[in-house]
Amino acid sequence: MAARVEAATMGGEIDEEESDERGSMWDLDQKLDQSMDEEAGRLRNMYREKKFSALLLLQLSFQSLGVVYGDLGTSPLYVFYNTFPHGIKDPEDIIGALSLIIYSLTLIPLLKYVFVVCKANDNGQGGTFALYSLLCRHAKVKTIQNQHRTDEELTTYSRTTFHEHSFAAKTKRWLEKRTSRKTALLILVLVGTCMVIGDGILTPAISVLSAAGGLRVNLPHISNGVVVFVAVVILVSLFSVQHYGTDRVGWLFAPIVFLWFLSIASIGMYNIWKHDTSVLKAFSPVYIYRYFKRGGRDRWTSLGGIMLSITGIEALFADLSHFPVSAVQIAFTVIVFPCLLLAYSGQAAYIRRYPDHVADAFYRSIPGSVYWPMFIIATAAAIVASQATISATFSLVKQALAHGCFPRVKVVHTSRKFLGQIYVPDINWILMILCIAVTAGFKNQSQIGNAYGTAVVIVMLVTTLLMTLIMILVWRCHWVLVLIFTVLSLVVECTYFSAMLFKIDQGGWVPLVIAAAFLLIMWVWHYGTLKRYEFEMHCRVSMAWILGLGPSLGLVRVPGVGLVYTELASGVPHIFSHFITNLPAIHSVVVFVCVKNLPVYTVPEEERFLVKRIGPKNFHMFRCVARYGYRDLHKKDDDFEKRLFESLFLYVRLESMMEGGCSDSDDYSICGSQQQLKDTLGNGNENENLATFDTFDSIESITPVKRVSNTVTASSQMSGVDELEFINGCRDAGVVHIMGNTVVRARREARFYKKIAIDYVYAFLRKICREHSVIYNVPQESLLNVGQIFYV
């Protein structure tokens, strides 16, 4: 039978009209390469939101201080100096600035993030990619359409249906209608992610430098160069110990930050009582109006400094996965919010009496008897705040990698207890170099603060736009509520953004340059990955042609198992046809392995593998889809190959039982665990079924064949036990991992920018990134690379 190349299909589901256009050959392919609906349908959606006792909730609220609120809590170190970098001209400006700080903390962190945005988590996961994953599950907005309807049966895959004429359904259709809208949404997510990465550079720089700046207050003879040197030493030490993880010292974070909040609140109350109680009138919003009424560009640009009072909220949302939302809400409303209000009010009271001390307002407002203890606490709190932001950056990079938007880098799991604690070596050293460059280059808080504020306000704008879609598609709120939330958020954030535009030439350009560099890398990588996937879809080979070659595939079937890795969940990849065209032999058992990342935070181990048979039994061909969420890691101790074979053996056993009368289906797919198999068999005679199951209770109970024939068994009626022995014998003979070593190039007629992106940038990124064989822990002696060139 002549070879045939199928046209690409980017969707997992194919409607009836498309099916009619494909004709009988497509129908034949579907019969030979059956879907996994039956298998996936067996999986019960067991996700339930955890409920916590009051005591445990208070404990988690306390622990959340060290992970979630360190960055937001250290803002008093530098806010007033960045608000009035040129000094204070009118004492009433202090009241106006304090009023702006109070209502900024109320509107953005408290009302928007803690009580609205944090509820838009993906099974407890936060960050821009978590919001994007939610949208991908409720609308077909992924640019790489490798999802299938069976993926929706995962216990962690939650979604809702829409009424056909609802506002949500209309918005969904509008998003899905054009590829340009999907692309724009992805770029929006990437911009937000890149800004958070920039935040991971700027937060340690400004926090540690501000904390170290306290040395000059009590030791005035020390030069600024010494302060910068001390800050750089602390930063190098901080990044150098990242590979140890925070598991061992993480228990210290919450007490340190808790002590910090109590200290700044106590000092704030002391300063209010001692210096000026009239600052409490700043709780009236009328002073905001008077502040701007006095006019002047300086008052408008001072919003850039006010903006720093709410920095850390982006890390708050990104680090949300460690704690339940209710714990985060309690910690903010009971401890963080009142302590910050007291701290800022106390500084304002001190500055009202000593306006010349605005540059070092925090340290100068500390009573002399507790100065050095506060310096130590401030430095420790700055380190904890930096650690939280660095950890959030690692998490976002991992999420971007899982979505195909970041080059393959090494990800290390640093804790056996907590899934979310990871370390990305390459990103860590890049962050350290850039952080030191920013600290040593600017040498002062003002310009770093301008850069920091620019990054944060852009992340807030991105979050607002994504939240608008979440409220429509996921929460299905009334359009009036959506409009109120969006308009109020954009009015506040665009006001801050307009003020930050005046700071671009004063350091605000730094996050833009950093974000542009990371955005270029992430977009080119995603574009190259997308084009490669489209090429594979277009060049996949018909199953009808493969099976038309007969059980031997027109080759010599040699003992062993061939695991053919592909990104396709259906059809035969081009790599396999290329392999059998150029080599005269193929393994007795062939398994097409598709490792797929889904827009869910995790895939339970018992649902990891989907297995099915391809064609008649005597072909000994199978397909295995390994599914991962964006938080799942490929670890060395995963035993990927072992678990794959366990799923394959379990499939063959269950298929044999079904053929014995339990099912009319010729092909059957299973996923996972013996308990699921027992549940499946529970409908019949329990004792008889369990006796049958116990016969195959373990792989070791199967007697391996000592010699494997070099030809495939001709009979399609091979029993389940015989086939298990055959596959196990082939496994003992040797397992070979067949992977594509593809080179992606732009076509000659491609545009200039596409040639630059594919032939140079993407090629360079692929050259320096990790190979799939390393990620999947494939032994080099069992690896077979098949070279190909893809022209896109």
UniProtKB/Swiss-Prot annotation:
Keywords, sorted A to Z: Cell membrane, Glycoprotein, Ion transport, Membrane, Potassium, Potassium transport, Transmembrane, Transmembrane helix, Transport
Source organism of this protein record: Arabidopsis thaliana (Mouse-ear cress)
Alphabetized Pfam families for the sequence: K_trans (PF02705), K_trans_C (PF22776)
GO cellular component: plasma membrane
Entry keyword annotation includes Repeat: no
Main location: membrane
Known glycosylation sites: N444
Record family assignment: Belongs to the HAK/KUP transporter (TC 2.A.72.3) family.
The protein's role, per its UniProt record: Probable potassium transporter.
The keyword Membrane is assigned to this record: yes
Membrane topology summary: Multi-pass membrane protein
GO molecular function, one term: potassium ion transmembrane transporter activity
Region called Disordered, residue ranges: 1-23
Name of the molecule in the record: Potassium transporter 11
Cytoplasmic side: 1-51, 118-185, 240-248, 321-322, 387-421, 476-478, 528-792
Transmembrane segments: 52-72, 97-117, 186-206, 219-239, 249-269, 300-320, 323-343, 366-386, 422-442, 455-475, 479-499, 507-527
All ranges on the Extracellular side of the membrane: 73-96, 207-218, 270-299, 344-365, 443-454, 500-506
Compartments reported by the entry: Cell membrane
Taxonomic superkingdom: Eukaryota
InterPro entries reported in the protein's UniProt record: K+_transporter, K_trans_C, K_trans_N
